[in-house]
Curated annotation (Swiss-Prot):
It comes from Pichia angusta. Keywords: ATP-binding, Glycerol metabolism, Kinase, Nucleotide-binding, Transferase. It is an enzyme of class 2 (transferase). Pathway: Polyol metabolism; glycerol fermentation; glycerone phosphate from glycerol (oxidative route): step 2/2. Its EC number is 2.7.1.28, 2.7.1.29. ATP binds at residues 421-424, 467-468, 523-524, 585-587. InterPro entries: DhaK_ATP, DhaK_dom, DhaL_dom, DhaL_dom_sf, Dihydroxyacetone_Kinase. It catalyses: dihydroxyacetone + ATP = dihydroxyacetone phosphate + ADP + H(+); D-glyceraldehyde + ATP = D-glyceraldehyde 3-phosphate + ADP + H(+). The active site is at 232 (tele-hemiaminal-histidine intermediate). This is Dihydroxyacetone kinase.
């Protein structure tokens, strides 16, 4: 086979979302923000918004429509959408009764959707954030503060809370919808298995053809499967060889879901008297012929080994991993989650494509020719300040930092291929290119400190997804706020190194409100915190701060990950990097490169900010 994906001239995510709207008359598309909305949603009900990285279709946009989601926000492949996109989705469908945001438990999603929720609350909009974490493959000891991953159970949550908000003339309150969603999440378990990793469009068509020895060591062998593999190619519980029969594999998976003696993975009780929902989810590359055979095996073993007879059985592609050749099993204890009300919501009619429905002839005839609409304004683009930077200094420093970061992108990508999902280098490069383009077009209002930082935040939010985009956007936005707050107190001023040091500390404290990561947790914070602290301690000496930043980044080679997808990776996969001192955190290395570029340019100029 020459390739596993077609070649596309246009952005694949945009093309997919537009195609989805062509095929579904009820949908509209905010093209600039990759937001799909149900054009029939009314403000007299709780709005349901969800989203995340692309590559899991039909999640999330495929669940937008009557009786399910009102808004779906799409990031790039395997990368969270930006806060700006999510805010656009919130503003596109405001509700008198508030909005429930449903998000899978991944760091980037929590950061971006959490920040969007906080912004909405600050404007007086009632918002609740419901986090789905149904994976049982990562045990209690290993998941620590990170929690369980969000998997196929997310699609059941979408259907249930969407119906709860839509059904009946006396519409449910935000609190009622959220409480039902919480009960469902608390009684939901999922585990998957796969024959191989998925392949990502635009990358080489299969990792096995790589000559890179490090990549080869992480591949599944020809007669091997991975139990518990995540939906972004994350490592699972174990690898099994030779490939077992489906009967043996299903028995193993059901034990992880239902064994009450397993202290690591026993998250939900299931008794023979409980009413249970079963979902068999296609990870994207399993044939329907096999999928229904697998489902039959699961149903039979539930009955014979556990005396459980599912009251509802759903089989299909609900939460995929691109072309992943695997499947997952999800069980929902309806008795404990809410009983009849849960079934009423599951059975509530909907036409969303993710729930295998269809439209009538009359609805097709009424389909509008155009579904593209303008995005609502998200921020005040005209906001200005009297906080002053030196134009020539800031431009030189930014250019140098971004260019230095771009030289490190291949190495960062290599590190993140092992420690994450491989997108960190590209994500940082996207941000660097966006800032360089802004400078080249002479559109950055550099002399206005607050305005220029706000502009940088906007382009970073647009260009960067994932965890890195969230961290950088929050930090830069908080830095701008700190400088603005000082102006409100004392009037206009020139930014000195000492003032910048104080505002950097304010920005770091603001960032800490949105992540539990601290120095020592093997994240970007290990480079950022020392930089900020040393910049303040040295009264604005960028060279000393740069040294501290580098030392912090290098220290991550010896640290154990506690956050993000790196926390799921086995120690065995880090061994190929022992010769260079260990595998560092990719985000920390990226920040160190950026700061190094800043320091190089600043040393040459030797002037004020």
């Amino acid at each position: 086979m020459s390739s596993k994906h077609w070649n596309y001239k246009q952005d694949l995510v945009h093309a997919h979302l537009k195609g989805l709207c062509h095929a579904n008359p009820d949908l509209q598309f905010i093209e600039s923000e990759r937001v799909v909305i149900n054009k029939h949603s009314k403000p007299d009900k709780v709005m349901i918004l969800s989203g995340g990285g692309s590559g899991h279709e039909p999640l999330h946009a495929g669940f937008v429509g009557e009786g399910c989601l009102d808004v779906g926000v799409a990031g790039f492949v395997f990368a969270s959408p930006s806060t700006k996109q999510i805010v656009s989705g919130l503003k596109a469908k405001p509700s008198d009764k508030g909005t429930l945001i449903v998000v899978k438990n991944y760091t980037g999603d929590i950061l971006h959707f959490g920040l969007a929720a906080e912004r909405a609350k600050a404007e007086g909009v009632p918002v609740e954030l419901l986090i789905v974490q149904d994976d049982v493959s990562v045990g209690r000891t290993k998941n620590g503060m990170v929690g369980r991953r969000g998997l196929a159970g997310t699609s059941l949550v979408h259907k249930i809370v969407g119906a709860k908000a839509a059904k009946d003339s006396n519409k449910a309150s935000l609190s009622e919808v959220y409480q039902l969603g919480e009960a469902v999440v608390a009684n939901l378990v999922t585990i998957g298995a796969s024959l191989d990793h998925c392949t990502i469009p635009g990358n080489r068509h299969h990792e096995s053809e790589s000559d890179d020895e490090d990549e080869q060591k992480h591949l599944l062998k020809e007669d091997e499967i991975e139990v518990g593999m995540g939906i972004h190619n994350e490592s699972g519980i174990k690898r099994v060889s030779p490939i077992p029969t489906i009967d043996t594999l299903v028995a193993d998976l059901l034990k992880y879901l239902l064994d009450k003696s397993d202290e690591e993975r026993h998250y939900v009780d299931f008794d023979s008297s409980d009413e249970v929902v079963l979902m068999i989810n296609n990870l994207g590359g399993t044939s329907n012929l096999e999928l229904y055979a697998i489902q039959n095996t699961v149903v039979e073993q539930l009955a014979t080994d556990y005396k459980i007879k599912p009251a509802r059985v759903y089989t299909g592609a609900y939460t995929t991993s691109l072309d992943g050749p695997g499947f997952s099993i999800t069980l929902l204890n309806v008795t404990r989650a809410g009983g009849k009300e849960v079934f009423d919501c599951l059975d509530y009619p909907t036409k969303v494509p993710g729930w295998n429905s269809s439209y009538t002839t009359a609805e097709w005839a009424a389909k509008s020719e155009s579904f593209v609409i303008d995005a609502p304004p998200v921020s005040d683009a005209s906001a200005t300040s009297k906080v002053r930077f030196s134009s020539s200094t800031v431009k030189a420093v930014l250019e140098s930092g971004c260019k230095k970061l771009l030289t490190k992108e291949p190495k960062i990508t290599l590190y993140d291929t092992v420690a994450g999902d491989g997108d960190c280098g590209e994500t940082l490069a996207n941000g660097a290119h966006a800032i360089l383009d802004l400078l080249a077009a002479d559109k950055l209002e550099i002399t206005d400190g607050v305005r220029s930082l706000t502009q940088i935040t906007d382009v970073v939010e647009t260009a960067m997804g994932g965890t890195s985009g969230g961290l950088y956007s929050i930090f830069i936005s908080a830095l701008a706020k700190s400088l603005k707050d000082r102006e409100l107190q004392q009037g206009g001023y020139e930014v000195t190194p000492q003032i910048l040091a104080a505002s950097l500390k304010d920005a770091l404290e603001s960032l800490y409100r949105y992540t539990r990561a601290r120095a020592g947790d093997r994240t970007l914070i290990d480079a950022l915190a020392p930089f900020v602290e040393q910049f303040a301690a040295s009264k604005g000496d960028l060279n000393q701060a740069n040294k501290a930043c580098h030392e912090g980044a290098e220290s991550t080679r010896k640290l154990k990950a506690k956050f993000g997808r790196a926390s799921y990776v086995s120690e065995e996969e880090f061994k190929p990097f022992e010769a260079e001192g260990g595998l560092p955190d990719p985000g920390a290395i990226g920040l160190a490169a950026l700061v190094d570029g800043f320091a190089e340019a600043y040393s040459k100029i030797g002037s004020n900010l």
